Each structure stands twice: as structure tokens, then as C-alpha cells.
């Protein structure tokens, strides 16, 4: 075969090589030419030379066959092409009946080992692997190549195709060919070959030749060669011509993969190797190796698209996740319709699931009265169950109970369980999802396990149909509990729910059957569900069970959504490229408030979450409830009220039960407006907010549609359940779970009204709001706020606590637990944002963090709480969870976001503090609403984080690790808190306590590199004369700079794990910015203990920062919001600092320890005037935390940092460069402050200067 000739390459090419060879200027060319056979030969000669024009004729020096062989053997390019390659190819082709291209590929892959090649061909290389490629690029080069191929046959084709091509072709001679192409191409047809002149198989030889290199690259890329970078491909590349030869044109490169050898049979190969083929090949070979998309970062997006990202779901981020997490996809996003049940699949398992659920309920209720009796013990829906982190079933009943309990405790489900515990039936139904038939705990346990096995995330974004049902059932049951009479189905059910194990459960089973199918419907959110909720008939009519199941099934993809909800890190740095979710991006906003990072203040992610979750989850969970409520709007309204009960879970449920009667009444009333809302609910706050009214309407509408979650509001109480639900998380936002939870509680406490209001209002609001801007929600929120504030408060105490939580917020522990909102895992936790941290588990819910406490709609917040709560178990939380969990990172905000949004505002309304708590994303919403003061920025930061500056605590102080929950990224960074480099500010060497005279700046630190040099730039001479004569002159000298002149560590210090700001999206420098002190006069900004107080310790008190705190608010940091966040709140934080009596730290300490100091203008003398003096380096000034040095003081002080900007480091260092803290005098700084104010802007104090 020509091939042989080719393989003969130079050798075979002998004669032809002469022709072509000359042209080729190499045996390779010759070989190709030869291969080309005479016909091609001449052409090859010309073409092959690539230089052929130039060298073609030069037959004078044709390498002898021996020379060629030697060249081939020694030529690395020919690489595996040993002279006998052609023979091997021929042999393989005969033995394996594979095309030359495939054979070449196999040989290439197998390093020319025939045996391995045979095996490779037979076992590995798919038949026709290269066949498809043929036509792709046949066009230009291929045409030529083909032409050649036709002429010369496979190999020949190449040769003739291009001068270079011919060379390239050289079968055996690939090396030479390539070389020739290189040489000859360069020389002779360098233009062609090298250039990729058309000669080269028409494909520009250059391309090909270059191609050779290119091929090599391609190989490197793994596209083509996937294997040898150059080897095969290179050869091919070098062959380029060869590969190109037949494949020429596209073939060659196209053929990148196997075909590298592909040149062979160029003609055929051409046909075979189309670029398309190349992909295909790549598919084959690369398949193993890389994806064709290997180069692109985009693939993430693309996959997302491939996954049928829905615009609605379309957070690129989210879908991308879906794509990457294919293995985890339970459904296809394409099918995702509403955000209805994310876990639909679980639910969807059988259209009969509803029936099964019914059975399961019946059996469970009947069979497992104990579990039923256990309000908390609802079987979580599969998704939720999986969320429940601990699903081990101890016993049948216990299993269910435990799971239920576990689920309840650890999951949003827990909330539902608690709230909806009434309906063991509900529980069962969920299990029924799992396999409705089994009342048996074991089965339930199995189901749980299954659920657990299921991707946990799914539940989180949206409730699966199952979950939706579950929560809906819970809420409806609760609702039923309250308004048992309202709906037949519910009525029956409530007893079941109320009396978890009541015989009525029997009825409940029927009801549940009714409901349950509806619940699936609820997932759909069609009225059917509601109808079903309304009565069995409705359920039947809804045919919701099947439909809902279908919907659920369809929705199952939404489960996927959930996944998306908490996108796993994509393999492609989707987030790096674009921070996941906007929350992260928000962080990227570079809100300088280091401490007050806006981890998700961004609403966009919220929107996603809202859309996804609110729509999906909300829809699934809330909507389910809502729809039950709405659809069954009539009596179901009662359900609507009821739903909150689930949230409170037991308590609230009970409370609600107590208050339900009232609410019931309102509910009916609400039904018209919003099934979910009780009229009382609506009345108090909702009336307050027209939004509520609208929401009521909207609830009916939007709730029923997307924001069922919103509707969940009342539903939300259920929403809490929803919250319990993963989806509910958002719902909760919408629902304003707190209301849901608290609300439900409130309802109990307050009366239906609060519960409803929050739930309704917020929920309603939320429903529309989250997706929307949340502002309405927030208006709603505001109104919610009122509600919260008004009626709610009683019930909201938790929230109050939350507020306190705000303070707490920083302290994750925060009573938040108190909040029932947390019903699930948070149950214990107050809603306080803290709660979320503390309760990451479930439902901890931002609610907690956000204001769950706020209790306002904070469910929304709660949602965030959820996020915070991040109880993974409850996916709803899950979302939150995501937030909470760092892993959930983006979600944090996200979760928070939607909910946050609501939350925030709600929070804000509820309390300012809350605001900060909710602070998250909501901030914007919050801003929009109440408190916006809070503050967006407040929002930005999760208040709950004890974000004290995690950075420098004190010079010697190791980073005090705070558990503050930053966003995921923050976490990444934060974790590294350690004394990063020596405490970052700490000097790595122990500095002498006194540097020469009282820490004269000039004091040399022998160990420190430049310490000896006096700072000529900033001579201290000023200092001595400086007005601050009060300070000991030595100090005064030092005053300005206040420390040996040590180079500060970089503000952005990447070492020591700390990666301060720059590591963060927001580039706040590690040094906390000093707030401009101008605003804060002397001590005001950062109060420091007296300079020489003997360490902050003595400064027993940092002031509460009363002023300071306020200053914070006032100061530039406002944006930081930290201040907004409330330094008031902060004051509490200060308490944390526990520095001592707050008052000790009177501004006087700072400010004017020395009259002169205050007067002194350090601009010049303290070289740091513009820039704060180096942060006290550890040894400097007061080398020690105890030292008078403010920094040291910071130790105690730091905790104060509740404010999000890290005041400690920056401020003290800046102000108190030296212990004397001359500089710190705020006045002085105040003066300079104007300059310095830039700091906040610049982020790095030096920047401004």
C-alpha cells in the first residue's frame, strides 16, 4: 500500500523521495512522495517538499534507504514511526480488518507494538473510530488531501496534496516528513508546508505543519493525540501532511485523535477524518482523556444549558451545578417545571405514592400511633429524610419516630414534624413516598435511608412533591388541627395531626389520602392539591395524587434544582470565574467592611433562590400548603393558618391549636384573600400592608403559583414547615418562617393574626417578594414588621431574643435557639442569627440569624436562618444550610437572600438588630424596607457572625478563631486564622519590650531587618518636638509612628493561611480599615484603653464603644453598616469584648490622654499620619496584649468587633501606633482622619495616604 511506501517513508520513498524527497527535503517527504507513489510522487515531490517547489527537484541528495531508516530511528519526531511501521500497519490492517487510520492510531497508542496494537484495535479502539471524521474538513484541505489521497492513495494523497503534505505524508518517515515539512517546508515549500500552504493537502501546510506542532499541541491538549504530545500526532502534525494527507485538511487536525497516524490512508482518512471525526475521535480517545471542551471554562455554562437550564432555574450557577453533578441528578432539569417538588422523584416513585402515602399514613398513624402521637415524629419526605442527617432506624416505630425525630430535630422536616407532627399521617405520607404502604417504622427507616441516600441537596432547593406534600400535610394537618372543621379532609386530618396517634388518624388516612395525593399536587401547586386538601374529592378531582406525582416526577428535576440550590463546587471554576450565586459576587463587591462582608446581601442570588426555592420550594412546600389552603381556600384557609403550626412544630402546633380556633376563624376569612392567611392574620399586619392584601390576593395567586411559598406564609407557618421543608426554606423566606414558626407560635400566642400576618404577610409578600425584589415582601415585611412588632412580639419573643440575638448574632449561640422558628433544628436555637450558626443543623435558619428572631417574616430571614441553620438535613435549610454551611456558601446569602431579603427587612422591622442579622442579602431588601438602615450593609454581613475581626486580635494574640460564619469563601480564608504569620502584625521576632527609649521609633531591633534605620522619611524629630509633649518624649518620638520602623506585613498577606482580604472577594485588606476617625473624635472611633492603661486589660473597659459603636455607625463605615448594623447592637458585642466596664474606656481614655496629643497633628511627624502607624507590630509599643498598647488591648477589645469591619486591627494600630497611642488620639486622627477616611474607601489604610 502506498502506506508501505510511506512507511518506507524515506526508504520506500527512495525513488519517489528523490522526486518528492528532494522537494520534501527529507526522506520523510520522500516517503510520502514515494507513498504518493509515482503519481503523487512527483506531486509529492513538489508538494511534499512543502518546499517541493523549491526542493522537489532537488533529487540530488536523496537519503539512502539506510540513511532514512537511521534518520527515522533516530528522529524523535518520527518517534514511533520506525521504518517498519508501514509494514506493521499493513499487517495490522490485514489482521484486524481495520482501516489504516485506526491501525495507525492503534500503533501510535501502543508505541508501535503490534500485539498491543491488535488488542487495542480489537478491544479499545471502536470500529470506525475515524470513519466519521472523514468529511468534516474535507472541504479545503481535505479536498486537496482527498484529491491527493485519491491520487496517491491514502498516503500518497497526503504527499501530493501538499508539497508539505507529501512530506508530511511520509508514512514511515513521519519524522522526516515532519522535519522535512519543517525543513523542506521551511526551506522548500516553507511557505506551503510551513505556512500551511494549501499545498499541504490544501490544508494550509502551515496549519498542518504548524499543524504538526499544532497537532502536537493538540495532542498535548489531549484533543488529538491525547497521548503523545507530538509523537503520533506530532508526527501526524509533522506529518501533518501525512495526517493531513489523507485526512488532510480537517482530517489531519480533525483527526487529531487517533488518526494522528491518520495521515495514512490520507485519502480515505480524509474521508474518515473530518474535523467532525476529530471530535468524534477526540470523543473516543479524548473521551477517556478530556472533554472536547477541555479548554473552556464555559463548559460549565454549556453543560448547564445542556442540562436544559431553565431560565427560571437558570442560575448559571445553579444549573451548572446540575450539570456537574450529573451523577447526582435525580431528574432532568428539562422536566423541571415549577419549582414544585424538588424531590419529586422521591415522591414521584409512583403515581400511587399518594395512595401509598395514604396507606402509609393510615398504617403509620394506625400502625404507629406512638409515632403519630409524637408530634415531632413525622416521617420526613424522602428528600427531607435524606436531609435528616441521622436516619438510622432503631426500631420500627422508633425508627419512624427517631427518623421523624431525627428528621424533625435535624431537619426542616423537624420543623414540619414538630409542627406537622400532628399528622403522623403526614409523616407516613412522606414515608409513603418512600413507600406509602409501610406503616412500619422499619420501612420508614428504609425510606429515610433511601431519602438520605438521595442527594440531600435536592430537598433543599425545593421541596420534592413528596416533601411538599409532607410539609403541606403537616401544615395542613396543623391547619386542620386548628380549623379541623374547616376542611373536611383537613378537619379529619387535624385530629390526626393533633392527636398524632388519634384514631382520627384513621380518618386522617382517608383525609390524608385525600390530602396526600393533593400534597403531591401541592407540589404541583395546582388547585388540585388545594382541592385535595379541601377534601378527598378535591384530591380525587385533582387526581392530584397521580397528577401531582406526575408533577412531582416532573418536578423531580426541580429536586435537581435543589441540587442547584446548593451547587457543589463545579469542576470548572464557575464560581471562581463568576462567584457562585450573586451572593458570593456580592462579596466580591468588595464591600470593604471586612467584618461586615456582604455575604449574600446580593439579592440576585436571592432571586435565584427565590425563584428556585420560593418558586419551587415555596411552591412545593408553601405552595402546597397554600394551595391546600388556597385550593381548599375555603376551609383550607384554616389550613393556611394551620400551617404555621407545623412550623412551630409541636409547640406552635399546640399553641396554634390553642390559638387556632381564633385563627381558624380568621382563616376562613382569609381564605378569600389568601387561603393561607387567616383573616386575623391578614388583619393585623396584613391589613397593615396593602401588600398583604395584595399578597392575600397574590397569595391566592402567586402563592398558589410560585410562591406558594409565599402563600406559605400562613402557609408559612406551615412554611416553617416548609422551612422544615427544604424548599420551605425559601418559602420560609416567603413565609417568613419565623412567622411561620413563630408566627404559628405567634398565632398561638398572638392569635392567628400574628401568625398569619407574618406568615401571610410575609409569606405572601415573600412569595411575591422573594422572587421579586422582596421589597414588597418587605413592605410586607415592614408591615410584617409591624405585625411582628405588634402582635408578633409576644410570640416573637424569640425574635426579640433574636434581636438580642442580633447582639447575639455575632454570638452564634444566641438564643436564637429560642426561636421556634428554628423549629427544626433550630427549635432550640433562638431564631437569632446566632441561632443559625449554632444551629447549623437545620432550620436553624437564618431565620435565626436573620431575624428569625425578627420573627418577622423572618422566616424569610429564617430562611436565611435556614441557610444559616444550614441544617443540612432540612434541605430547605439546606439552602440555608448551604449558607450556613460554608459549603453552601453562596447559598448563604442566597438562602438568606431570598429569605434574607425578606428576612432582612423583616428582621429590620422586627429589630434593627435582626436586620443586621438578617443582614444578609436581605440587606437590599431590608434596605428597601425597614431598617433598610440596616442595613444593607448590615445585611451584607451576616450579623450572626461574630465577625470580630478575625484578623489580628492582638499582637501576640493568635488569631482568635472565630466560628463566625462567613461565606463559604470567607470560611476558606478564615479557617486559616492562626497567628498567620506571626500574628500578622505580630512581629516574627520577639521585639524587646522597650525599643531603646520607651519604644523610640529609632530603637533598633537587631533582629529586624531595617529596624535600625531611622525613618529618614518620617523623622521622628518632629515627634519629639511634637505638641504631644505630654507623652514622654520618647513616646512622643515614637508617638507618631509608635513603633520601631518595621515594615508592616502586607495588608494583603497571603502567607499564614490568612489570605486576608485579597483572598476574599472583597479585597478588604487584612488590616481592618480604620474608620476615619475624624468623625469619631478622640476616643470615639475606637476607644482604646488609656494608652498606658496597662494593656487593654486595665482598660477594663473598652467602652461599650457606646460612643465608639455609635461612631461606627456614624463613620465611614456606615456603609459597612456594621455601625448601622448597629453598633448599638455592637455595643452588645462590646460586652462581648468584656473588656471591662465599658465606661472605663471612656473616650477620654483615647482621646485626650494628652491635651497636646489631641492637638498634635501627626500628619507629618507621625509618618503614619496618612497611614496608620504600623499596626503595632507585636513587640512594638506594647509588645503584648497586655501592654498598654492598644493593640494588645485589642485582645479584649476585639470581640467587640461585632462590627463587621475589623476595628481592632486597623483602628488601634492606626490610632495607637504606639502604646502611648499618641496617634490614636482621635482628634489628631480626626484631623488626619479626613485624609484617612479614604481608608474605608481604599480599604487599605495606606492607600489613602
Curated annotation (Swiss-Prot):
UniProt keyword Phosphoprotein present: yes
Compositionally biased tracts (Polar residues): 457-494, 678-705, 738-769, 777-809, 862-873, 1124-1138, 1216-1249
Compositional bias annotation for Basic and acidic residues: 210-227
Domain (UBA) ranges: 84-124
Classification via CDD domains: UBA_UBP2_like
UniProt biased composition (Gly residues): 7-30, 38-50, 186-209, 228-240, 248-269
Domain of life: Eukaryota
Bias (Low complexity) ranges: 350-369, 549-559, 616-639, 647-664, 706-717, 811-861, 874-884, 892-922, 1023-1034
Keyword Cytoplasm included in the entry's annotation: yes
BP term (GO), one: copulation
Keywords: Behavior, Cytoplasm, Phosphoprotein
Subcellular location per the Swiss-Prot or TrEMBL entry: Cytoplasm
Free-text function comment from the UniProt entry: Acts in the nervous system to mediate the control of copulatory organs during courtship.
PANTHER family tied to this protein: PROTEIN LINGERER (PTHR16308:SF13), UBIQUITIN ASSOCIATED PROTEIN 2-LIKE/LINGERER (PTHR16308)
Protein name: Protein lingerer
Taxonomic source organism: Anopheles gambiae (African malaria mosquito)
Primary gene name: lig
Amino acid at each position: 500500500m502506498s502506506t508501505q511506501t510511506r512507511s518506507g517513508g524515506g526508504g520506500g520513498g527512495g525513488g519517489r523521495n528523490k522526486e518528492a524527497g528532494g522537494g520534501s527535503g527529507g526522506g520523510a517527504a520522500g516517503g510520502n512522495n514515494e507513498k504518493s507513489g509515482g503519481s503523487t510522487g512527483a506531486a509529492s515531490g513538489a508538494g511534499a517538499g512543502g518546499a517541493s517547489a523549491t526542493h522537489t527537484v532537488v533529487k540530488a541528495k536523496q537519503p539512502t534507504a539506510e540513511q532514512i531508516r537511521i534518520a527515522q530511528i533516530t528522529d524523535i519526531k518520527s518517534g514511533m514511526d520506525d521504518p517498519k511501521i508501514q509494514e506493521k500497519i499493513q499487517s495490522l490492517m490485514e489482521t484486524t480488518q481495520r482501516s489504516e487510520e485506526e491501525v495507525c492510531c492503534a500503533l501510535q497508542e501502543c508505541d508501535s507494538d503490534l500485539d498491543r496494537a491488535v488488542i487495542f484495535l480489537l478491544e479499545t479502539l471502536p470500529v470506525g473510530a475515524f470513519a466519521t471524521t472523514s468529511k468534516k474538513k474535507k472541504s479545503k484541505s481535505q479536498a486537496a488531501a482527498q484529491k491527493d489521497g485519491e491520487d496517491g492513495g491514502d498516503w500518497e494523497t497526503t504527499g501530493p496534496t501538499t508539497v508539505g503534505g507529501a512530506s508530511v505524508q511520509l508514512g514511515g518517515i513521519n519524522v522526516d516528513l515532519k522535519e522535512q515539512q519543517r525543513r523542506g517546508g521551511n526551506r522548500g515549500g516553507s511557505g506551503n508546508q510551513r505556512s500551511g500552504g494549501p499545498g499541504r493537502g490544501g490544508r494550509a501546510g502551515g496549519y498542518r505543519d504548524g499543524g504538526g506542532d499544532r497537532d502536537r499541541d493538540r495532542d498535548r491538549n489531549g484533543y488529538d493525540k491525547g497521548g503523545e504530545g507530538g509523537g503520533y500526532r506530532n508526527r501526524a502534525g509533522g506529518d501533518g501532511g501525512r495526517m493531513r494527507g489523507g485526512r488532510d485538511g480537517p482530517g489531519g487536525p480533525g483527526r487529531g485523535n487517533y488518526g494522528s497516524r491518520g495521515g495514512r490512508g490520507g485519502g480515505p482518512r480524509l474521508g474518515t477524518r473530518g474535523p467532525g471525526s476529530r471530535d468524534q475521535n477526540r470523543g473516543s480517545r479524548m473521551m477517556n482523556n478530556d472533554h472536547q471542551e477541555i479548554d473552556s471554562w464555559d463548559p460549565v455554562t454549556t453543560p448547564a444549558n445542556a442540562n436544559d437550564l431553565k431560565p427560571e432555574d437558570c442560575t448559571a450557577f445553579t444549573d451548572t451545578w446540575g450539570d456537574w453533578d450529573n451523577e447526582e441528578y435525580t431528574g432532568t432539569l428539562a422536566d423541571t417545571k415549577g419549582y414544585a417538588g424538588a424531590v419529586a422523584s422521591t415522591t414521584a416513585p409512583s403515581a400511587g405514592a399518594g395512595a401509598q402515602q395514604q396507606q402509609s399514613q393510615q398504617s403509620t398513624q394506625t400502625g404507629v400511633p406512638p409515632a403519630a402521637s409524637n408530634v415531632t415524629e413525622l416521617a420526613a419526605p424522602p428528600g427531607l429524610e435524606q436531609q435528616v442527617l441521622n436516619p438510622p432506624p432503631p426500631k420500627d416505630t422508633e425508627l419512624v419516630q427517631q427518623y421523624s425525630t431525627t428528621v424533625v430535630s435535624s431537619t426542616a422536616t423537624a420543623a414540619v414534624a414538630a409542627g406537622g407532627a400532628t399528622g403522623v399521617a403526614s409523616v407516613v405520607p412522606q414515608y409513603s413516598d418512600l413507600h406509602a404502604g409501610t406503616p412500619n417504622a422499619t420501612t420508614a427507616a428504609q425510606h429515610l435511608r433511601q431519602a438520605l441516600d438521595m442527594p440531600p441537596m435536592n430537598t433543599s432547593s425545593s421541596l420534592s412533591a413528596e416533601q411538599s406534600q409532607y410539609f403541606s400535610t403537616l401544615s395542613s394537618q396543623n391547619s386542620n388541627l386548628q380549623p379541623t372543621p374547616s376542611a373536611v379532609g383537613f378537619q379529619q386530618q387535624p385530629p390526626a395531626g393533633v392527636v398524632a396517634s388519634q384514631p382520627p388518624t384513621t380518618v386522617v388516612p382517608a383525609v390524608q389520602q385525600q390530602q396526600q395525593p393533593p400534597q403531591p399536587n401541592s407540589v404541583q401547586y395546582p388547585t388540585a392539591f388545594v382541592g385535595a386538601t379541601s377534601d378527598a374529592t378535591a384530591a380525587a378531582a385533582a387526581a392530584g395524587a397521580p397528577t401531582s406525582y406526575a408533577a412531582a416526577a416532573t418536578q423531580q428535576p426541580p429536586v435537581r434544582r435543589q441540587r442547584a440550590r446548593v451547587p457543589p463546587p463545579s469542576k470548572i471554576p464557575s464560581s471562581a470565574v463568576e462567584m457562585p450565586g450573586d451572593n458570593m459576587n456580592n462579596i466580591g463587591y468588595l464591600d470593604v467592611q471586612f467584618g461586615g462582608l456582604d455575604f449574600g446581601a446580593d439579592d440576585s442570588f436571592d432571586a435565584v433562590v427565590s425563584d428556585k426555592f420560593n418558586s419551587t420550594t415555596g411552591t412545593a412546600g408553601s405552595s402546597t400548603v397554600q394551595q391546600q389552603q388556597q385550593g381548599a381556600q375555603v376551609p383550607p384557609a384554616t389550613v393556611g393558618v394551620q400551617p404555621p403550626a407545623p412550623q412551630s412544630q409541636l409547640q406552635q402546633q399546640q399553641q396554634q391549636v390553642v390559638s387556632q380556633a381564633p385563627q381558624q376563624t380568621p382563616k376562613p376569612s382569609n381564605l378569600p384573600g389568601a387561603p393561607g392567611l387567616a383573616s386575623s392574620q391578614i388583619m393585623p399586619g396584613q391589613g397593615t400592608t396593602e401588600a398583604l392584601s395584595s399578597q392575600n390576593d397574590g397569595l391566592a395567586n402567586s402563592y398558589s403559583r410560585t410562591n406558594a411559598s409565599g402563600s406559605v406564609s400562613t402557609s408559612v407557618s406551615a412554611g416553617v414547615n416548609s422551612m422544615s421543608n427544604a424548599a420551605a426554606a425559601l418559602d420560609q423566606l416567603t413565609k417568613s418562617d419565623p412567622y411561620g414558626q413563630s408566627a404559628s407560635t405567634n398565632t398561638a400566642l398572638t392569635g392567628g393574626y400574628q401568625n398569619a400576618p407574618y406568615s401571610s404577610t410575609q409569606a405572601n409578600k415573600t412569595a411575591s417578594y422573594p422572587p421579586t425584589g422582596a421589597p414588597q415582601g418587605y413592605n410586607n415585611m415592614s408591615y410584617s414588621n409591624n405585625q411582628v412588632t405588634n402582635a408578633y412580639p409576644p410570640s416573637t419573643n424569640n425574635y426579640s431574643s433574636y434581636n438580642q440575638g442580633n447582639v447575639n448574632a455575632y454570638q452564634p449561640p444566641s438564643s436564637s435557639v429560642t426561636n421556634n422558628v428554628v423549629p427544626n433544628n433550630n427549635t432550640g436555637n433562638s431564631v437569632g442569627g446566632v441561632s443559625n450558626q449554632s444551629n447549623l443543623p437545620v432550620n436553624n435558619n437564618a431565620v435565626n440569624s436573620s431575624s428569625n428572631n425578627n420573627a418577622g417574616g423572618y422566616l424569610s430571614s429564617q430562611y436565611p436562618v435556614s441557610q444559616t441553620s444550614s441544617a443540612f438535613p432540612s434541605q430547605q435549610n439546606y439552602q440555608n444550610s448551604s449558607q450556613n454551611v460554608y459549603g453552601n456558601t453562596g447559598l448563604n446569602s442566597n438562602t438568606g437572600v431570598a429569605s434574607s431579603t425578606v428576612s432582612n427587612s423583616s428582621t429590620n422591622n422586627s429589630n434593627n438588630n435582626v436586620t443586621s442579622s438578617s443582614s444578609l442579602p436581605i440587606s437590599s431588601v431590608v434596605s428597601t424596607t425597614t431598617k433598610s438602615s440596616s442595613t444593607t450593609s448590615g445585611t451584607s454581613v451576616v450579623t450572626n457572625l461574630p465577625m470580630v475581626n478575625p484578623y489580628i486580635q492582638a499582637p501576640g494574640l493568635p488569631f482568635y478563631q472565630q466560628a463566625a460564619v462567613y461565606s463559604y469563601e470567607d470560611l476558606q480564608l478564615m479557617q486559616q486564622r492562626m497567628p498567620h504569620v506571626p500574628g500578622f502584625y505580630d512581629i516574627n521576632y520577639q521585639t524587646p519590650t522597650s525599643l531603646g527609649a520607651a519604644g523610640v521609633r529609632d530603637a533598633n531591633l537587631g533582629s529586624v531587618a531595617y529596624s535600625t534605620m531611622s525613618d529618614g522619611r518620617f523623622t521622628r524629630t518632629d515627634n519629639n518636638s511634637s505638641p504631644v509633649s505630654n507623652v514622654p518624649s520618647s513616646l512622643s518620638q515614637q508617638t507618631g509612628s509608635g513603633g520601631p520602623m518595621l515594615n508592616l506585613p502586607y495588608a494583603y498577606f497571603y502567607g499564614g493561611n490568612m489570605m486576608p482580604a485579597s483572598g476574599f472577594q472583597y479585597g478588604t485588606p487584612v488590616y481592618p480599615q480604620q474608620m476615619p476617625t475624624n468623625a469619631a473624635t478622640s476616643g470615639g472611633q475606637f476607644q482604646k484603653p488609656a494608652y498606658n492603661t496597662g494593656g487593654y486589660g486595665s482598660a477594663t473597659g473598652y467602652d461599650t464603644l457606646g460612643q465608639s459603636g455609635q461612631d461606627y455607625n456614624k463613620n465611614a463605615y456606615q456603609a459597612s453598616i456594621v455601625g448601622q448594623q448597629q453598633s448599638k447592637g455592637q455595643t452588645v458585642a462590646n460586652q462581648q469584648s468584656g473588656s471591662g466596664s465599658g465606661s472605663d474606656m471612656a473616650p477620654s481614655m483615647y482621646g485626650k490622654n494628652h491635651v497636646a496629643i489631641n492637638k498634635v497633628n501627626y500628619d507629618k511627624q507621625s509618618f503614619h499620619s496618612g497611614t496608620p502607624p504600623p499596626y503595632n507590630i507585636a513587640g512594638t509599643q506594647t509588645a503584648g496584649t497586655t501592654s498598654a498598647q492598644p493593640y494588645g488591648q485589642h485582645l479584649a477589645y476585639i470581640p467587640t468587633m461585632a462590627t463587621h469591619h475589623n476595628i481592632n486591627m486597623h483602628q488601634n494600630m492606626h490610632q495607637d501606633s504606639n502604646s502611648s497611642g499618641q496617634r490614636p488620639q482621635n482628634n489628631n486622627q480626626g484631623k488626619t482622619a479626613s485624609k484617612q477616611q479614604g481608608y474605608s474607601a481604599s480599604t487599605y489604610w495606606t492607600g489613602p495616604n
